[in-house]
């Protein structure tokens, strides 16, 4: 699954790097019938104390989402998603460029985000 995620993210970043803004966030969505998706956004603002920092979108992949089906609960999906993103931030094509942003995070759009790195 990581390979497909990395291909999706590489394609997005090939077309859009450098992303505008100061921080990045991976929005995770629960779709229907155990389908899940991830959207990349960049934000004009970052403050770890402000839980809405990722609402200040400067860039978004919009409907171009990474999607998959998996029969597990949302907690496991959050773990799996963060693990894929951390792996990309370690070995992905744009890992070093993404880590130049103030922070990178991931989380469900209706919940808290997990800070994956800070600069």
Residue ranges and their predicted role:
Residues 19-46:
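N-terminal interaction modules that seed assembly of large macromolecular complexes
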Residues 36-72, 117:
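Intrinsically disordered, low-complexity regulatory segments enriched in Ser/Thr/Pro
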């Amino acid at each position: 699954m990581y390979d497909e995620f990395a291909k999706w993210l590489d394609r997005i970043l090939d077309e859009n790097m450098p992303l505008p803004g100061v921080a990045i966030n991976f929005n995770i969505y629960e779709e229907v019938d155990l389908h899940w998706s991830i959207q990349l956004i960049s934000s004009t603002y970052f403050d770890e104390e402000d839980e809405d920092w990722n609402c200040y979108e400067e860039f978004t992949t919009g409907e171009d989402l990474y999607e998959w089906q998996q029969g597990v609960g949302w907690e496991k999906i959050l773990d799996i998603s963060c693990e894929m993103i951390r792996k990309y931030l370690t070995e992905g094509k744009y890992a070093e460029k993404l880590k130049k942003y103030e922070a990178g995070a991931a989380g469900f759009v209706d919940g808290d985000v997990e800070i994956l790195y800070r600069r």
